[in-house]
A protein has these predicted regions:
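Terminal leader/tail segments of proteins
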Residues: 1-127
Length: 127
């Protein structure tokens, strides 16, 4: 479990949620991500991120994702525990459904160069 470092931008939020935790582990599953019949990603090297107040999320290495199907968007969000997230879309029905922390905070640096998918927009198979 990472110990979160304080800086002036993170301090107000981190002090309000003192027992927040994030755990990152290597998944033991073969993961396939599909949108309909389209295989978006397939990996044996995914990570699973367990975070307070969130469902577990699989993060897959960029090299295992068919990035040619995705279009980067202008959306950027901020998480005081992970950093700034960038997003990708597949089509008008799948807007901003893939995200990545390109420069995550040191406590979660393992997810650098990994992407995750909103599970309500894709089918994730585990084998």
């Amino acid at each position: 479990m990472p110990q979160f470092s304080m800086n002036e931008s993170r301090r107000p939020i981190l002090e309000q949620i003192p027992n927040y935790s994030i755990e990152i582990a290597r998944s033991q599953h073969h993961i396939i991500v599909r949108s309909g019949n389209i295989v978006l990603a397939e990996s044996d090297e995914s990570l699973i991120l367990r975070e307070t107040r969130h469902e577990d999320a699989f993060y897959l290495p960029k090299r295992d994702i068919n990035l040619s199907l995705l279009t980067p968007t202008d959306l950027s969000t901020y998480c005081p525990f992970k950093g700034h997230a960038s997003y990708w879309s597949l089509n008008e029905n799948h807007i901003n459904f893939v995200w990545s922390y390109e420069d995550p905070y040191p406590e979660v640096k393992a997810i650098r160069s990994y992407l995750s998918f909103y599970t309500d927009k894709v089918m994730i198979e585990t084998k």
